[in-house]
C-alpha cells in the first residue's frame, strides 16, 4: 500500500453457513477425528455440498477409524441446517463417501526426504521429513490492529461471527445460517482512518420486512455491537454506509442456493487480499501438507517480526520442493516500514525459525485435533480461540538477532 494519498480497501468474510464453509468445516472435522486417534494420519479430504447432498472424497492413510457420515451430519446440524425450510437438513441429506489411500510415491518423499535418500543425512529426524508438495506460502502482519491483522478482514470476520452469534443465541431468531459481510476502509497512506462501507447479506425467514426489521436489527445488534466491542478510537465511524441484502430478499440460501466446495475461500481464510497468497487451501489437510503448516508458520514469523518492532508491515514468503526438508527460498518484504536493514531481518528470521516441515510441526505442536475451529472466521488473527501460530513467543529473540 502506498505511503501517501487516500484510497479505499475492501475485504470480505462469510459465515459458517456459507456453502463453501460448510465444506471446510466437514473436511476439518474429519481431519480432527482422525488426528484424535492417530496423530500421524495422512489426510487430504475434499467436500462438495449441493441440494440435499454431501460428497466427501480424498486420500487418507491412517490406523484410525472415523464415522464419516455421522461427522458430516453432526457438522451440518451444528452449523444450523436442521430443516428443509432452511434449504438443507443434516438429518436427511444424502452422504456419499469416496476415500482412497495416499499415493505411496508422495508418502516416500514425506517419510524419507531427499536429504535422507540422496544426501545421506539420516541422524536428524527433522531432516528426514520432506515437504508433502512443492509450493509457495506467504505470511503477513501489520500494526493495523492489536492482533496485527489488516483492519478490513479483521472487522469483516467480527461481523460474520456476530451474525452467527445473534442467530444461534436467539437474539435475531429469524436469521438463517448462510451469510456474508464486506468492509471497505479508507486509508491515508498506511493508516486506516475511516470506515466507509459495510455490506451484510444474510439468509432469513420468508416473512420478515427488510427495511423495517432486518436493516435496523443488523445495524444495532451486529454493526454497532462489533464497533463498540473493538473500540477503534482512531477510526472515523461517524458516517458508515450500511448495505443490507442489496439484492432484496435472501430466503433461498445454503447448499440449495449455491453448491459449495472445500478450499474455495482462501482469501477469506487469510488476509482479505491485503497480502499475497500462494494458492494452496488449508481445510482437510494434515500438517505434513506445507500448504497448511508452512502458511501457519509464515504467519507466526510475520507476527513475531512486527511484534518485535522490526517493521510496521511485513510479508514473508517461503517455498518448498516436494520431498525436500529444507526450504528452497525465503523472501521478506517490509514495504519501506522496516526499522533496520531488511537483509538483517531476513538473516534474523533464518536464525530464530526452523522452517523445515518437521520442525514447523514440532514447534507449533500441529499433530493435534485443532483444525475444525479454524474452518470459519479466518485462520489468522483470531481473538476468540487460542492458536499456536498467533503466539509472539519469539519476538524478543528475533529483535535481539536483528540487532535492535
From Swiss-Prot:
The keyword Oxidoreductase does not apply. Binds 2 divalent ions per subunit. Binds 1 potassium ion per subunit. It catalyses: L-methionine + ATP + H2O = S-adenosyl-L-methionine + phosphate + diphosphate. Residues 102-112 are annotated as: Flexible loop. GO terms for molecular function: ATP binding; magnesium ion binding; methionine adenosyltransferase activity. Its EC number is 2.5.1.6. ATP binds at residues 18, 178-180, 249-250, 258, 264-265, 281, 285. L-methionine binds at residues 59, 102, 258, 289. InterPro entries: ADOMET_SYNTHASE_CS, S-AdoMet_synt_C, S-AdoMet_synt_central, S-AdoMet_synt_N, S-AdoMet_synthetase, S-AdoMet_synthetase_sfam. Belongs to the AdoMet synthase family. NCBIfam families: metK (TIGR01034). Catalyzes the formation of S-adenosylmethionine (AdoMet) from methionine and ATP. The overall synthetic reaction is composed of two sequential steps, AdoMet formation and the subsequent tripolyphosphate hydrolysis which occurs prior to release of AdoMet from the enzyme. This is S-adenosylmethionine synthase. The gene is metK.
